[in-house]
Amino acid sequence: MTVDRNYIRNFSIVAHIDHGKSTLADRLIQMTGGLETREMKEQVLDSMDIERERGITIKAQTVRLHYKAKNGETYILNLIDTPGHVDFAYEVSRSLAACEGSLLVVDASQGVEAQTLANVYQAIDNSHELVVVLNKVDLPAAEPERVKEQIEDVIGIDTSEAVEISAKTGFGVPDVLEAIVRQLPPPHIGDVKNPLKVMLVDSWYDAYLGVIVLVRVIDGILKKGQIIRMMGTGVKYLVERVGVFTPKMVQVDTLGPGEIGFITASIKEVADTRVGDTITEERRPCENALPGFKPAQPVVFCGIFPIDAADFDGLRAAMGKLRLNDASFSFEMETSAALGFGFRCGFLGLLHLEIIQERLEREFNLDLIATAPSVVYRMNMNNGSVKELHNPADMPDLVKVSSIEEPWIRATIMTPDDYLGAILELCQERRGIQVGLSYVGTRAMVTYNLPLNEVVFDFYDRLKSISKGYASFDYQMTDYSEGDLVKMSILVNGESIDALSMLVHRTVAEKRGRSMCEKLKDLIPQHMFQIPIQAAIGGKIIARETIRALRKDVTAKCYGGDVTRKRKLLEKQKEGKKRMRQFGKVEIPQSAFIEALKMSK
């Protein structure tokens, strides 16, 4: 028995990090009786430990709620809780495409932030109806009226029907449920009689059931025992279970048009279930697939190596398991003279990189070292071909390269105007080009074009420290453009260290090189001979530091006597040191690499 689609509401919650959207989801589940009170815990939908600790949502989660409205009808509300962070924007886009409306949650004490804007525009692009919800109105610093004005000015949507709530205490949450039923539309299209057409919203790996696929039915009926086909990959599967999340997994007989639920079909890998793909029935396929999603492209690359070489196989297995669950993460093997065997990994952004590294260390008990993050450069070769460069150590000979292009981003920064000067300075320092500046009350919104290379290092940390944590930042990839980029190598005792080489803009090369040499000088222990540490571009040395040699006091046993006796001993020592320097190898401890790489970020 399928549900009349007029009584279905599919919606997502759009908000900036920390504006309380997972807490609001908890309250909605509690008030509609989705879980018993004893089963409730904070952030029910954030199932990973790391999500709960950092207070962020990474994987989009879904839940089906039954709500008896004031008009006496019972509605089915399908909530998709989306991530708020810029790196996981692809999770947001696929979740939004499965819904018809969104709750826009804004913190009444902080107002509109950069990521609120990015996600709202995505919702508007998907032609969503929006219900404005002002959260945290019980805080002493809350200014709901000012924030309403700000929403109207910045986003340009009507806030006369905005709902004021406190998700923590539950105040105003029943009004949100009423607003969902009243203001959001039911699914627009869908016919039970049409051939099966289902949108694949998300998928994740379960040790017992294989891949669990989150789906939104558009046409037809999805039931157990059907043979389905993925239109993107052409692979066929037999549906074994059909169900919904309440947020517990509950099996149902069928899913009809407009409904959101899950299926399992003994699928082995998440990579087989491409998000945004269309699922249809093998026996009676639909004519055309849904307008497809782009598979997520990695933006930031870095090398990940085990500190203990014996952990290499464990790392390979762990990465394979994470890949099961995260199709946007890619990796391939690489070797480094300094760090041994490891992997070159691609990520959606810096937070994604940090989270994958932390999950590898935490869930699989591995000790890892990550090289400095780099972006994908395009090399225009003299023979007319174009090569992509993921690792600065693989840079071809500059004689063969006619030009190098680097990726640029369009960054939006929202900040209280007190910190504006320092933030503009930071953007200029990072080769930024200002595109726009506007004021909303006491907050400024700045738009800059920035090279991604300058952002992946420590831009976010610097921005937060300059603005004492008040500025928020969001970016979209724009395009590649040519830059005066050079490969900077670090030489220790005349030998190049591949793990520390990086591509930098010529104007900042000297500064970066000097700071790297100074750090290494403190980190590499003294040897019996002096060690030069140099930063070089091609054959030109741009910075140098020297680690002094350890030396024994050879003249200690001379009491008085002729000065030539002392000189002879000192000359002999000098001769030995010189020979040592020719044949001696510099031992660079692993800890020095780890520290240098940490700092170079």
Curated annotation (Swiss-Prot):
Assigned keywords, A-Z: Cell inner membrane, Cell membrane, GTP-binding, Hydrolase, Membrane, Nucleotide-binding, Protein biosynthesis
Spell out where the chain crosses the membrane.
none
Which Pfam families does this UniProt record tie to the protein? EFG_C (PF00679), GTP_EFTU (PF00009), GTP_EFTU_D2 (PF03144), LepA_C (PF06421)
Q: What class of enzyme is it?
A: hydrolase
May I have one GO cellular component term?
plasma membrane
Specify whether Repeat is a keyword of the entry.
no
Its annotated function is as follows: Required for accurate and efficient protein synthesis under certain stress conditions. May act as a fidelity factor of the translation reaction, by catalyzing a one-codon backward translocation of tRNAs on improperly translocated ribosomes. Back-translocation proceeds from a post-translocation (POST) complex to a pre-translocation (PRE) complex, thus giving elongation factor G a second chance to translocate the tRNAs correctly. Binds to ribosomes in a GTP-dependent manner.
Protein family (similarity comment): Belongs to the TRAFAC class translation factor GTPase superfamily. Classic translation factor GTPase family. LepA subfamily.
* Name of the molecule in the record: Elongation factor 4
